[in-house]
A protein has these predicted regions:
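Short, solvent-exposed amphipathic alpha-helical segments in soluble enzyme
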Residues: 269-271, 334-338, 419-422, 530-531, ...
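Active-site/ligand-binding-proximal alpha/beta "capping" segment
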Residues: 319-347, 354
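Catalytic or ion-translocation cores adjacent to nucleophile or general acid/base/metal-coordination motifs
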Residues: 204-225, 232, 239-243, 248-251, ...
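Small-residue-enriched alpha-helical segments and adjacent helix-cap loops
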Residues: 539, 543-574
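Glycine-rich beta-alpha junction loops
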Residues: 282, 324-327, 346-351, 407-413, ...
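Long, compositionally biased, glycine/small-hydrophobic-enriched stretches that function as flexible linkers
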Residues: 1-196, 201-209, 375-525, 529-542, ...
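Short catalytic-loop micro-motif centered on adjacent basic/acidic residues
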Residues: 251-254, 318-322, 404
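Residue-level detector of anion-binding/catalytic polar loops
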Residues: 274, 339, 402
Length: 676
């Protein structure tokens, strides 16, 4: 047994404390959080933190944790960061009694890999506050439980806290994850700040808290699809064919080079456009540049603007990053009358007061200081910045730019700030990308962000899986109806180019938008390849929560639901329950994700497949439900694409019977109301 395995099995040290670890200034750290707790609540926060440790250590740890709470607004327990390097190892290197649990351990470590995580030492994976655990004691204890558990047990995870191992059975999930599940009346931003500071709840974002983040590749594909289809909309509106050749030279302007938003420059390159992405955090910008995800860094607008003009004129495929405030960028583009084709934003506006958005007129360092020391002044600065932000976008939109909200609460927070973002009827001036693109073209037809991770961590296994997937999609395309041929063609192109685009950051993983038929056939083929030894180790199947069925989010995933049910969350809850008893290895359900705490309910799953007949059964049963639950809900909302998809699925699957909506002549309804 090596030191890595010994440290995992040791869990939380019981005999001797590890030495305090120096604060590493070479990595990106979370900003200081709001000082929100009362004096008595701070006492409670310390008591809550100390309950993980034997009483003999409390006198030494209490002042240390109190200082962390004062300095950072949270108790992270930095001392307990493990001594080993953090990355996903091949499955056979983990100490375990359950191979399924070993796979989960690898997925957890991939989330925390410094190449992958946004603020790894604060256990924040992406989005400024998307946490996998609240503190390092929770990480250590969880890894110990996973190493010790059998396939007859289930680990319950309460917002990062491992509540314990409970007896179950081999077909039950090995882990059930909940994040941020609070009583609905206590789901405001300050509630999260308070509960998180107390150590009793966390914001798990989506794949951050559910052990399914695969680095920026996870969103590159969705962003590529979005940018390409937005470009097609623009070209079509101009009477031009939506070909890749015609997209060259188009200008896409946006913001954010963080964990999720860092995908935008790569997506722009794959789509073949000129992209300009603003990022105020120099460390984040440099990280994406060093990883090869953005081509050029520019700190001066006087240098950037001529470079943009030249790139557009030469129809280059290039990604430019502006290291500065996005409002300054938008205002300069408007002042110079630069013809922007596509505009969006991926600042973390789901978290506007705690590092998700930095106001114009302040340096990054000044904003961090104001955020912690003058929170109300910071809030007003953010609101004023959003008003200017929207004003510049409106000027460029009047000149023909197509702007879309990328599901980060930009429209929502801008409206709350009093920006000119609403139409006279109270609706938003700009669409969500789900309303215009992902909803009608992808989700309604059952296409969503299916993904897999090779537990061998061997690139050759990933290459083999790519080959299998593309062959299955090409076969599906042969008999596919016209409505989904475009989606299949885009995804065939994606997977064929994936290796050349160097998308892997962290684990050997791939994402691919596929429908129920595609996901199931691909997964079964993977399982057969494992069985035959063509793929050398198990594979983890999963998806982003940003999918057909997993998320109820009225300002994003379900923004194209128009029957009045977009503020309900039955679909997401039904989904996680159904996945849990149909063969998922782990399931998760979260409050928040994408648009923010209190605005969303979202869930996900992971499934370990190992070449067994049980894996075949789990694939067939669970993936079918995981997609068709959402199609059924969307078809009941009378979404045309979903109605087509569910009727096709009922023809393909005789055991499926879905309640079908009858359409009404609106004139009959209006007349009935008028005659009352």
């Amino acid at each position: 047994m090596d030191k890595f395995q010994e440290e995992i099995l040791a869990g939380i040290p019981q005999d001797r404390l590890p030495e305090p670890k120096p604060y590493d200034k070479t990595i990106n750290h979370a900003p200081k959080r709001k000082d929100i707790l009362t004096a008595e609540e701070k006492v409670l926060a310390l008591k809550n933190a100390l309950r993980y440790f034997p009483a003999k250590f409390h006198a030494e740890l209490a002042p240390e944790f109190a200082k962390e709470l004062k300095d950072y607004g949270r108790i992270y327990m930095y001392r307990f960061r493990p001594s080993y390097d953090m990355y996903a190892r091949p499955i056979d290197e983990y100490p375990c009694r359950s191979r399924q649990a070993a796979a989960i351990m690898a997925m957890i470590q991939n989330n925390l890999d410094p190449r992958v995580a946004q603020h790894p030492h604060e256990l924040i994976i992406y989005g400024g506050n998307g946490a996998i655990f609240q503190n390092w004691a929770q990480y250590r204890l969880t890894m110990k439980y996973l190493a010790e558990m059998t396939d007859e047990q289930t680990l319950s995870m309460y917002s990062g806290h491992p509540m314990g191992l409970f007896p179950s059975h081999k077909d039950a999930p090995r882990v059930v994850v909940t994040n941020g599940m609070v009583i609905p009346n206590y789901s405001k931003q300050d509630d999260w700040e308070r509960f998180n500071a107390l150590g009793v709840s966390q914001y798990g974002q989506m794949t951050a808290g559910s052990y399914m983040y695969i680095g920026p590749q996870g969103i590159v594909h969705g962003t590529t699809i979005t940018v390409m289809n937005a470009a097609r909309k623009q070209l079509k509106a101009r009477g031009i064919a939506g070909t890749r050749e015609n997209m060259k030279g188009m200008l896409f302007v946006t913001a954010g080079l963080g964990g999720m938003s860092g995908a935008q420059p790569k997506a722009g390159n794959i789509a073949g456009v000129v992209s300009v992405t603003a990022e105020i955090n120099p460390l984040a910008a440099r990280k994406r540049y060093d990883q090869g995800w953005v081509d050029e860094l520019h700190e001066n607008l006087d240098e950037l603007i001529p470079r943009v003009r030249k790139a557009m004129e030469n129809k280059e495929t290039v990604s430019l990053a502006y290291v500065g405030n996005v409002v300054d960028l938008w205002e300069r583009l408007a002042a110079e009358n630069i013809p922007v084709d596509l505009g969006s934003d991926q600042t973390s506006l789901h978290n506007p007061w705690a590092g998700g958005y930095y106001p114009v007129g302040q340096t990054f360092e000044e904003s961090v200081k104001m955020m912690a020391e003058e929170p109300e002044r910071f809030r007003e600065a953010v609101r004023a910045s959003l008003r200017r932000h929207v004003a510049a976008i409106n000027r460029l939109s009047a000149g023909g730019m197509y702007f879309f909200d990328y599901g980060n609460a930009f429209l929502l927070e801008s409206s709350r700030a009093g920006a000119d973002i609403l139409r006279p009827d109270g609706t938003f001036r700009y669409p969500s990308y789900v309303q215009d693109i992902m909803g009608p073209l992808y989700f309604d037809y059952g296409f969503g962000p299916f993904r897999w991770v090779c537990m061998s961590e061997r690139p050759e296994d990933l290459a083999k899986s790519d080959e299998i997937a593309v062959n299955i999609l090409k076969k599906e395309l042969e008999t596919a109806p016209e409505e989904i041929q475009g989606q299949l063609n885009d995804n065939i192109h994606w997977i064929e180019e994936a290796g050349r685009n160097n998308l892997v950051v962290g684990s050997q993983a791939r994402i691919l938008y596929a429908d129920c038929e595609g996901r199931t056939k691909i997964a079964l083929a993977f399982n057969e390849a494992i069985r035959k030894g063509e793929i050398s180790a198990p594979i983890v199947l999963g998806r982003d929560h940003h999918d057909v069925s997993g998320t109820d989010s009225p300002f994003r995933e379900t923004s194209n639901i128009y029957d009045g049910s977009r503020f309900t969350a039955d679909m997401a809850i039904q989904n996680v329950i159904g996945d849990g008893f149909r063969g998922a290895t782990w399931v998760s359900i979260h409050n928040g994700g994408g648009v923010g705490w209190g605005e969303v309910i979202n869930g996900g799953f992971g499934m370990v497949i190992d070449g067994s007949a049980d894996s075949d059964r789990h694939i067939t049963q669970m993936l079918f439900w995981d997609v068709n639950n959402g199609i059924a809900r969307r078809s009941w909302a009378r979404n045309e694409g979903a109605e087509h998809a569910i009727m096709r699925e009922m023809e393909r699957t005789p055991e499926l019977t879905v309640t079908v909506a009858n359409h009404t002549d609106e004139n009959i309804v209006r007349k009935a109301i008028e005659e009352l």
